[in-house]
Curated annotation (Swiss-Prot):
The keyword Transmembrane applies. Heme c 1 binds at C73, C76, H77. The chain crosses the membrane at residues 25-45, 258-278. It comes from Mycobacterium tuberculosis (strain ATCC 25618 / H37Rv). Residues 60-140, 161-239 form the Cytochrome c domain. The gene is qcrC. It is a multi-pass membrane protein. This is Cytochrome bc1 complex cytochrome c subunit.
């Protein structure tokens, strides 16, 4: 009997041990499955870190821009774009838009100190202008140029569709200096508003964005991008379209027209007086 009781007791203990072992194994398996699922969800839901890595072409563009800047610009604008007193302003915040306007119109690099840098043939080609602009943009920030989907500088796409609105905005904001036909005019202290005929669409836009020389800046709060495009369209039509009114006398408006009328009238009056005198 004792032996039988011992056997039953030992079997019972062995069964309980096996059940505990199975529970532990099943718990471990469930824990492993849960950890695997949690790890997978974490890997899927965790955003990939955004690491700013410049590609080789961008790095080459910036290196070229720095070389050109150090060669042609640093003496007036400083090694850190901070400007040099009595030589050149800071370029921090002007962006590639200012670089495009100043360099593509030949105003920069300036040949000499004067009241206003005139327009002339640029000394840099488009690729070099892009490189200088990229360098200034990367180190100083500011407004950028508008590009086509292929990366080229936008021009024709910057012309708006509402010429009437563009004309109204031009006469309200620009005609006091540039004349209502965009021919420009004299300002104080030897400065002047330039003729807009040679400017392309991008140059007109970047001038409005950056305010070169004495020109004010026009932010998007003052003139929306669409409003700027309408102004550009009006300027290009006014400077390119054939005028049906005969000889334009420079397109400067009432002043030369009044002078022409006065001269023609005086010549006619003198001629008439001489003819009357000869008849009598």
């Amino acid at each position: 009997m004792t032996k039988l009781g011992f056997t039953r007791s030992g079997g019972s203990k062995s069964g309980r041990t096996r059940r505990r072992l199975r529970r532990r194994l099943s718990g471990g398996v469930l824990l492993l499955i849960a950890l695997t699922i949690a790890g997978g969800l974490a890997a899927v839901l965790t955003p990939t870190p955004q690491v700013a890595v410049a590609d080789e072409s961008s790095s080459a563009l910036l290196r070229t821009g720095k070389q050109l800047f150090d060669t042609s610009c640093v003496s007036c604008h400083g090694a850190n774009l901070q400007g040099v007193p009595d030589h050149g302003p800071s370029l921090i915040g002007v962006g590639e838009a200012a670089v495009y306007f100043q360099v593509s119109t030949g105003r920069m690099p300036a040949m000499r100190g004067e009241a206003q840098a005139p327009r002339k043939d640029p000394i840099f080609d488009e690729a070099q202008i892009d490189a200088i602009g990229a360098y200034v943009q990367a180190n100083g920030g500011g407004p950028t140029v508008v590009r086509n989907p292929d990366g080229s500088i936008a021009t024709q796409s910057l012309r708006g569709n509402d010429l009437g609105r563009g004309g109204d905005l031009f006469r309200l904001n620009c005609a006091s200096c540039h004349n209502f036909t965009g021919k420009g005019g004299a300002l104080s202290s030897g400065k002047y508003a330039p003729d807009l005929a040679p400017a392309n669409e991008q140059q007109i836009l970047t001038a409005m964005l950056t305010g070169p020389q004495n020109m004010p800046k026009f932010s998007n709060r003052q003139l929306s991008f669409e409003a700027k495009k309408d102004i550009i369209a009006y300027v290009k039509v006014a400077t390119e379209a054939r005028q049906p009114g005969g000889y334009l006398l420079g397109g400067f408006g009432p002043a030369p027209e009044g002078m022409a009328m006065w001269i023609i009238g005086m010549v006619a009056a003198i001629g008439l007086a001489l003819w009357i005198g000869a008849r009598s």
